[in-house]
Amino acid sequence: MYKVYEKIESINGSVITVRAKGVHYGELARVKTAFGDSLAEVNKLEGDVVSLQVFAGGRGISTGSEVRFLGRGMLVSFSDYLLGRIFNGSGVPRDGGPALKEGRVEIGGPSVNPAKRVIARRMIRTGIPMIDVFNTLVVSQKLPIFSSSGEPYNELLARIAMQAEVDVIVLGGMGLKHDDYLYFKSALEEAGALSRAVLFVHTASDPTVECLMVPDMCLAVAEQFALKGRDVLVLLTDMTNFADAMKEIAIIQEQVPSNRGYPGDLYSQLASRYEKAVDFDDAGSVTILAVTTMPGDDVTHPVPDNTGYITEGQFYLKNGRIEPFGSLSRLKQNVNGRTRADHRALMDNMIKLYAAYRDALEKRSMGFAMSEWDEKLLTYGGLFEAQLMDLSVNIPLEEAFDTGWKILGRCFTPEETGIRSDLINTYWPA
């Protein structure tokens, strides 16, 4: 039975306060406003004083507006009919299609029991050499993409969504510009990837509280697909916008701020989402790749700083490329011994030589004389950046290995590479 109240104690922006009993945290309510009904979510409890975040904002609400508690949290529909659909942060269709009501599940549930998980040992191929070869993405891994503003992180996510060898893509956009939303939609449609994808999109003009629901919507749907035996890749952008939405609501609620004004539970809120990554023992999997922009390119900003303690590595996007120094996949050793015999040796030695190339660049910029070895390194670095680091490169893993060997063969003798002789004998280009 619904609890109905017709007295609002206070209205502070989009947050209203009522006195109610038997209400739980995260419960939904329906608020009657002068412009129609709006959903609201309980986000603070102090005895019988209940604070609710109104999705549509405080406009049109009076102290006599009716508040009807629904006795449940936010639900999201789940079925194969979700594939190819686009929704907002409340689960309402954005694509003009019909609303879905079957198989509804509650969002924001607990993480999977570790006893039900298996150790990550399977690779997700993306067709991007800087991921597949040098920082392999592993099934059930959770990884952020740290990026400055202006970097092509949404283009990178779209590439991964189109090319990743998984069963289902769940894309969550938080605080997206409308142009970015249209870009994702058109890119997936043109590539024929929308038919295996579900999009939950919150744009910058949508209610703030919906931004907080996007990751939970995505992860609830992803978990249900995984329980049906599907391998799911969840792509989120931008987790800094998610944290800023938390910060905005915390300020309205007059919570005591922590580092740079963010709420004190920022770490827990981020961890509760990332920990949904899982490889089920007897079903599918959920893998999470999330963009985290760094304001002012500051990796010590609270959002990337806290994220780094939660995730299993990170990708750094810099100058339009995935930077090899600083980027790390902590689970890559679980899979790169199973791909091809030369994977680890090629990966390690190519990065070692690229580091030497960076030193040679610095040496040249300071006016030092270039040795024959330095010239070889400069040639190698240019080829490495053009044929493997460039984000427009789209080649299978085995072709990326062969390209790496060809680059080494053009620039060095076998002895100069530092790769062991049995691999040289097998893979060195003729």
UniProtKB/Swiss-Prot annotation:
Superkingdom, natural source: Bacteria
Gene3D superfamilies: 3.40.50.12240
Listed InterPro entries: ATP-synt_VA_C, ATPase_F1/V1/A1_a/bsu_N, ATPase_F1/V1/A1_a/bsu_nucl-bd, P-loop_NTPase, V-ATPase_su_B/beta
Protein's GO biological process: proton motive force-driven plasma membrane ATP synthesis
KW Lipid metabolism (keyword) present: no
GO function term, MF aspect, one: ATP binding
Annotated HAMAP family: ATP_synth_B_arch
Role this protein plays: Produces ATP from ADP in the presence of a proton gradient across the membrane. The V-type beta chain is a regulatory subunit.
Protein family membership: Belongs to the ATPase alpha/beta chains family.
Protein's name according to its UniProt entry: V-type ATP synthase beta chain 1
